[in-house]
Amino acid sequence: MIAQDIEKVLLSEEEIENRCVELAHQIEEDYKESGETPIVVGLLKGSVPFMAELIKRFEFPCEIDFMSVSSYDGTESIGDVRILKDMDLSCKNRSILVVEDIIDTGRTLVEVKKMFKNKGCLDVRCVTLLDKPSRRVCEIEADYVGF
């Protein structure tokens, strides 16, 4: 049943689950090939359900951490990216897989990737459930895109 304030469902639960399986397999192949043990970093709080769906399907070693960043005031992007909670693990000389729920303007991802590079990370990749390239104001793309 659809709530009264929702006009229509764009993606079914089954479509999302199937795409998560495909993404997890693709990510797994890439990391198995490289032999790396990445730190999977979820950007709080929106990425949590998507990240849970992904990592329960991973069949390769990884560590999990979270960051809280914001470039929004309510529903509007303000352009300024702030780190509200940094990750706990050391990421120097490590590979990072950033998990995003949606890439909109791209500002958050640009700043997060820059921060990881400045901390000495070897490799920074990103997986997002939803991508909105029509809203992009920065030159950036996710390495893995759900929809």
Regions found by a protein language model. Give the residues of each.
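PRPP-associated nucleotide enzymes
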Residues: M1-F147
